Amino acid sequence: MISVTGIGIISAIGNNTTETVTSLRLGRSGIGEVRYLNTVHHSLPVGEVKMSNDELRTLLHIPAGTFASRTTLLGVHALRQAIADAGLSVGEISARRSVLISGTTVGDMDVVGHSNVIPQWSLGRETRDMATLCGLDVEVCTVSTACSSSLNAIILGCEMLRNGEADIVIAGGTEALSLLHFNGFRSLMILDSHPCRPFDATRAGLNLGEGAAYVVLQRSSEAGHTRAFIKGYANRCDAFHQTATSANAEGAYLAMTGALRMAGLQPADIDYVNAHGTATPDNDLSESRAIRRVYGKLDLPISSTKGMTGHTTSASGSIETVLCILAMENGFIPPNVGWHEPMNEGILPYVGKDTVSLENVMCNAFGFGGNDSSLVICRSGEEGTLRKTAGHSGRGEADEHCGRDEADGHGGKTCEETARHSVGEIVSDVTIDNVEQLKDVGAFIPPMAARRMCKLMKAAMLTSLRALRESGLETPDAIVTATAYGMRENSVKMLNDLLEYGEETMSPTLFMQSTHNTIGSAIAIQTKCHGYNITYTQGEKSFEWALRDARRLISTGQAENVLVGWHDETDDGGIFSRSLILRK
């Protein structure tokens, strides 16, 4: 069993857990006029943290000369809270097999939006910076699956603990408002000019927010004290479209049912669902359909807290995990602020209720590309009845001894050596390192579709589909992607336009194809893969993390085969794409 032993949070509704509980109980929204983001679009409300960068630096005792983006500052603030809440010292954490796993999409882009320097978009640097500023000497990992990033960070942390790869994991996510993603969402025409209204008939879009939240995770047998237990989780893919969801919300449905199955719970056992609930017409309708598929006609309390915090994108999953834990501890259901009129085919959200007992809670986080994840959080550490018989994935129980004698997670070998010789067999391995090799993409992708792809996407598609064909597969069980810099070509184009021409020029097409999980989700869409889907972006360590995950999926029986890819543009404008199939 996995225990949450510490929590930390900062968002538009509070700089700590005490302030956050007060805001939740009062239904106090943190959404308002732009104050700190230097944008021309002041008519669009946002959920900003109520502190400037200078105020955050002063609070955190970070010297002015030390580089730290707003994303980093928010993350450090929440991290320090979580560590203190767990009753652990930095020295104790550093002396154990400990890991910091963070989810983000923006990274340091809030700094770039105010400079003439376009960096290599390395999200992994931000996670390393946070560890350094917190004094942590630990392994670091960055997950980037858009709006499900931080929930997937928590899932990864639980998996590492269950399989003996770590003793302490600090997992969550951080995201600051930036001109890049603010105008990117604006280009998609999904930002509301009024405070958002999740699941309301008049909903007209989301309000972006910012913040950070982290949880300290430990095996329950080693936990000093426990605030909550994480019993179930699932990461699935809708495999439909980069920004839209399928009509029956297959990814969301699979994530929720998978989390329930792992927890050993029936739908009737869940006392509250914290919905993703972005207030966009598409999300709220599809999520309502998915919830009805899972829970039927159960009179189940459901609400979205984004009417208070705004949509904190990559940080939303961990922020809402902490909100769920606070609601469980204090006996209330967070209100669905802004809701007044039922929507057609929609769920009826709770507007808030005090004095309730919440034993089992589900938290949803759904991202661009159909990267959908769900988490089941419980007050009791007792095993669910289904879990005892069904196993973790339905394919067999995890090997609880896997990796326990491996201090660095791969026994001193490189991860590739471990993947080849310890768990699984590489049955196909395809590499492209020259743009000229892209001429073969027509054998796999129609010309019209290929014309809309940047060169890195073409390379990733070509190596992935060729590896699948060589291994005799059409659809992999899981897709694990590594990329140090993501869709750099598209990102640089957007940043150049933003810096040279201003905020009115953002291309919605480029924005949709700029997130680090674009490649993994596009491959899932192409191959109709609804299984586990994650993207690692930790610099030169990205591929190692991907191989470790693929190995874990196979050793725990969660997958028979995994498509693992490493896709990056080189500094000289070239490309490198490698895809392999790891099979049991």
Question: Language-model segments: which ranges?
Answer:
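Conserved "HGTGT" condensation-loop signature of ketosynthase/thiolase-family condensing enzymes
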Residues: 1-138, 159, 178, 186-207, ...
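Compositionally biased, intrinsically disordered linkers/stalks adjacent to structured regions
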Residues: 142-144
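Short conserved active-site loop signatures built around small residues
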Residues: 150
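Internal active-site segments that recognize and position negatively charged phosphoryl groups
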Residues: 156
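Alpha-to-beta junction loops
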Residues: 165-168, 558-560
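Acidic/serine-rich, low-complexity amphipathic helices located in mid- to C-terminal regulatory regions
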Residues: 168, 173-175, 568
